Regions:
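Binding-site signature for planar aromatic cofactors or substrates
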Residues: 2-260
């Protein structure tokens, strides 16, 4: 038999078409590939302004604060606003930020609960705590109450001094047993290096508290802050804000409206 002659040009063409077809099929299976220079750029994180731009603002449904009709002294106004916050269902409306300062640590702040109000504002804590030590060095403090839903704030400045011992003892005995145990177990703000040892100290303190209902640490202190200045702030729908400041003058108070 004679040898079969194959057209080389035709064979090369068929081979080329087959390779292109196989390559195309491979691309379809692997998915489209985006060239590196046209890949989408990673989106940058939003700026702080972008994060808060859409945040809700106060729309208070409360009586407008007017200097002429405001009380002659600030405590009654504070109590009225506190009652409004309680009626509105504000969580812990008696919570406030206590600001203190010392030479070593500078200014610091933390949230506490108000214990009572008469002519002074009362709170309790250990005199050996950081805030207690700061007050011992500089008795000047500031208390800031903020009720966001009502668009209201009250800032009290004055001096914190230790009140009668019986007030501190009564407060401590009315605290939850677990809270009393925490105060007895370890000095406040002590660093915890050993969780197991801390738990054991807390268990011992619980046993002490259960055994003696009258147990009150010597360092537990009721502080009273006689206000020297009280500034009240209220957001309104018609204006950005209204501010009134009360300054103590002897046994009286001077009121002034402040520019926002």
């Amino acid at each position: 038999m004679g040898a079969r002659v194959v057209d080389k040009a035709s064979s090369d063409s068929e081979t080329s078409r087959t390779c292109r077809t196989d390559a195309a099929a491979g691309r379809e299976q692997a998915g489209a590939v985006t060239p590196p220079d046209t890949a989408p750029a990673a989106s940058s994180p939003p700026s702080f302004r972008d994060r808060v731009r859409g945040a809700a603002s106060p729309s208070p449904d409360v009586a407008e604060l007017v200097l002429a009709s405001s009380p002659a002294e600030p405590v009654s106004l504070f109590l009225r606003w506190l009652d409004d916050a309680v009626a509105a269902g504000v969580v812990q409306p008696h919570a406030f930020t206590l600001s203190t300062a010392s030479t070593a640590s500078g200014p610091t702040a933390r949230t506490l609960l108000l214990k009572d109000v008469d002519d002074s504002f009362w709170f309790t804590s250990s005199s050996l705590s950081p805030k207690g030590r700061q007050i011992a060095e500089d008795e000047r403090v500031a208390l800031t109450f903020f009720w966001a839903a009502q668009g209201r704030q009250v800032r009290v400045t004055g001096s914190a001094v230790a009140g009668p011992r019986d007030v501190a003892e009564e407060d401590f005995r009315h605290r939850h047993p677990d809270s009393r145990a925490v105060a007895v177990a370890v000095p406040q703000s002590t660093e915890v290096d050993d969780d197991e040892a801390a738990d054991e100290a807390l268990d011992r303190a619980r046993a002490e508290v259960e055994a003696d209902d009258d147990l009150v640490p010597d360092d537990w202190t009721a502080y009273r802050v006689l206000p020297m200045s009280v500034e009240v702030w209220q957001a309104t729908t018609g204006r950005d804000q209204v501010r009134v400041r009360y300054d103590r003058v002897g046994d009286d108070w001077r009121r002034a409206s402040l520019w926002p």
